[in-house]
């Protein structure tokens, strides 16, 4: 399989130049100002932006068990439309991803679909019971496991969480933390996030584990995590497009953690500009409109993530496309141990072609995802994905 990409403006975390890319057997084989090959498929980019495809550190595909909301196929196709070729899926499926059988189902289905790379998280505690860690022993020799997560139901017992972090460190896993204190989750969601953030940061320092703080949304939580990172703690920090693109004043849409105040958004953007944020994760969480009307928290995000982040960060706040590529591609690839996220010879040929000058209007009826739950309906942003390439194959084309 060969593909020649011509006339691209090539951008990744450290590069920005015009050139061509030759792909062979799924990897980048040659990069130059001009490349000519006979009898190969050619994609003419017409000087549009070509970046490493995005990798989502945080998504929910609802499969198995909740597939009226989303499934592995619809979620993967939505990812491709959004420019993503890799996702890390949370464990709150039905049954919960606490057993080899459930994890193998996801892997087998993903391989059968052959659309994107899917990393399935294991639940921190067995079936989210908050206390049992024995199931983690099943995965100690499974080198495909990259992360364990409590997203959906946090681990309230600090001793259990510390032990889980120690197990994660022993196995070179990332522990993904959904910081929400159950004592405050019904009364004050700001305190709920801040209190659990403080705890998990302290446990991360104590255990030495790599702890990934998911969907950080308050200025206080940011300050706590950044201080620990500066002290050398092995912590990575994730924010979402909706916590960048919305404030409570614009749309107090129900997500968890909630849409925050203007000053929180300003602090997130400031932290991005200072290089203190590691990844942007969508927290793609599809629900039916009926479920949303009854208060289910969450929103779809894969198909809108890039235009929101590009518009809010690059066009409005002066963040470079290089930095955005770092947040959406390079750092997520490093986090998940993937040979992707940059444009260099020998790297997997996962790429996205984008028209950054094209204005789009969010229309949920055009989503490939089964979910239509978005607070961005009717809003306009810049940046349209024209094509997504996975292992040298064009998997999505506008």
Curated annotation (Swiss-Prot):
GO terms for molecular function: allantoinase activity; dihydroorotase activity; zinc ion binding. Gene3D superfamilies: Metal-dependent hydrolases. InterPro entries: Amidohydro-rel (IPR006680), DHOase (IPR004722), DHOase/Allantoinase_Hydrolase (IPR050138), Dihydroorotase_CS (IPR002195), Metal-dep_hydrolase_composite (IPR011059), Metal_Hydrolase (IPR032466). Pfam families: Amidohydro_1. GO terms for biological process: 'de novo' UMP biosynthetic process; purine nucleobase catabolic process. Its EC number is 3.5.2.3. The keyword Disulfide bond does not apply. Pathway: Pyrimidine metabolism; UMP biosynthesis via de novo pathway; (S)-dihydroorotate from bicarbonate: step 3/3. GO terms for cellular component: cytoplasm. Keywords: Hydrolase, Metal-binding, Pyrimidine biosynthesis, Zinc. Zn(2+) 2 binds at residues 151, 178, 215. Zn(2+) 1 binds at residues 58, 60, 151, 283. Its cofactor is Zn(2+). It comes from the Bacteria. It is an enzyme of class 3 (hydrolase). It catalyses: (S)-dihydroorotate + H2O = N-carbamoyl-L-aspartate + H(+). Substrate binds at residues 60-62, 92, 256, 287, 297-298. Binds 2 Zn(2+) ions per subunit. The active site is at residue 283. Belongs to the metallo-dependent hydrolases superfamily. DHOase family. Class I DHOase subfamily. Catalyzes the reversible cyclization of carbamoyl aspartate to dihydroorotate. This is Dihydroorotase. It comes from Clostridium botulinum (strain Alaska E43 / Type E3).
